Amino acid sequence: KHYTMIDEKSFDKIVQGKQVGIYTIISNSGLKAQITNYGAKIVSLFVPSDNGSLTDVVLGFNTLDEWLTQEVYFNGINGRVAGRISNAQAEIDGQIYNFTKNNGIHTLHGGNQGFNDKVWEVVETSENAITLHYLSPDGEEGFPGNLHVLVRYVLEGNDLNIYYDANTDQPTIINLTNHAYFNLKGEGQGSIHDHTLQVLAEEYIPYDENTLPIGCVKSVEGTPMDMRQSTLIADRINDPFFAAGLGIDNGWALPGWNDPCSTSPLRLAAVLKGGNYTMETWTTFPCMQVYSGNYVENHVGKSGAEYAPQCAICLEAELFPDAVHHTQFPNSIIRPGEKWQHQTVYRFL
């Protein structure tokens, strides 16, 4: 299957009063990505194979207009707080803040207009990297503090690196992730049921029926969350355990998550295999949220194929969901003077 680069002219628009564009970066080994500053999204990710052909392994659309109207968070940066904040409120230093309710009574992925829906500033580009900046102003979606966020995409060899950097002028909460939808057979190439997934975690984060953590961490032993060995997704995805989310939409606690002395080195969190590729996910984040695209439908993608539920999978490295309500979870509050830095690597083998 032949994949074509997206025409940069189709992204040349003014949105929210700001210039949008699409930027192509390439590594020394031919890994190629197209990034737009609308939502800091990965528009395409072309992975080279041994025979020199390229496969685009992320879902997406050919025109900016289509990106502006889709509602399933394709490939962007979720923030200010990825995941749900229960009851759309939180207490920070004794003060209660109310956030936008955009998921029933809860806040999802930052509110009505999260970071995935903002036009970012392009700070720097080079042949293999792009740095994007967004200033989330005090009070945006109810969150306190002016939060500066830098996201840097860097291609090295067959690695897509994502570097996150944030600082604030008031105590606030933060959780950033990239919501890329992967199909290693290629975008538009059907279901991911034939992929295998390995999650290198001994523990998981139990959720209630609203996909909110109940507040503890449990062993994966003897549960459908035990994917320490490579597991065919088709053999696991229809387990009643995953019925509430119509498929996998669950969080694993990665090794070392509760070690207060850990400096969070990069750790191998997950291995996904499909088509001709193996993709490792390495991260400094303590949680791996896996989402099997259960609500993807009614979209026609880049190559003209209609996207159906479970035609892609997201491996979202992040802080624990709803951590602000659970003191036993790793801290999600960022304070003035603190450096908030994380890294996630998608490595293709």
Residue ranges and their predicted role:
Residues 3-349:
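An exposed, glycine/acidic-rich loop-and-rim segment of catalytic or binding clefts
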